[in-house]
Amino acid sequence: MQHAYDEHLATNRYFDRKFGLEAAKILPGEYYVANQEALLVTVLGSCVAACIRDADSGIGGMNHFMLPDDGGRDKVGMSARYGTYAMEVLINHLLKLGARRNRFEAKVFGGGAVLASLASSNVGARNAEFVLDFLKTEKIPVVAKDLLDSYPRKVYYFPYSGKVLVKKLHRVHNDTLFSRENDYKVRLSGAPMDGDIELFI
């Protein structure tokens, strides 16, 4: 059965020769889950990624999102609903694969101040604050984090083992990251947030 939120599942899958694993590249607004050995990869600027796994079974996943700019008007309202949706979609899919919520652990990354167009809204810091607050509220322990600062990061997540490799990109040789995040920001500003999502128990 297909769910409405399946449209956010990453579709860019490939075989990573360096690590010898099936891999998924997660773009802004997407997520991916795995119940076997796999590699999840993303590049983060102002966005954040939550890597959540069942520490016993190795079922895990990663999302990649940012809160829409609300101009500082709506700290816990509409803007936070986008982040909550991104987190709950990931958690629901993990539970659907058989993960147990009481065995979840999280690692979080991103929230850098890397886009000049987003600097005034401090969106990276808002994203980082949101993801930490969400996980605290949901009682999911954060076992590792690399947040804020002024550079992009490339994150390699191996959900089965929980291992993460983070490459800090002090030099970005093209504007792909920046254009992806700007495009995502534009999509967020025009997208209605209808309805709620219920947690799969």
Curated annotation (Swiss-Prot):
Disulfide bonds: none annotated. One of its GO terms (molecular function) is protein-glutamine glutaminase activity. Keywords: Chemotaxis, Hydrolase. InterPro entries: CheD-like_sf, Chemorcpt_Glu_NH3ase_CheD, Cytotoxic_necrot_fac-like_cat. It comes from the Bacteria. Its EC number is 3.5.1.44. One of its GO terms (biological process) is chemotaxis. Pfam families: CheD (PF03975). It catalyses: L-glutaminyl-[protein] + H2O = L-glutamyl-[protein] + NH4(+). Belongs to the CheD family. NCBIfam families: PRK13487.1. Probably deamidates glutamine residues to glutamate on methyl-accepting chemotaxis receptors (MCPs), playing an important role in chemotaxis. This is Probable chemoreceptor glutamine deamidase CheD 1. It comes from Dechloromonas aromatica (strain RCB).
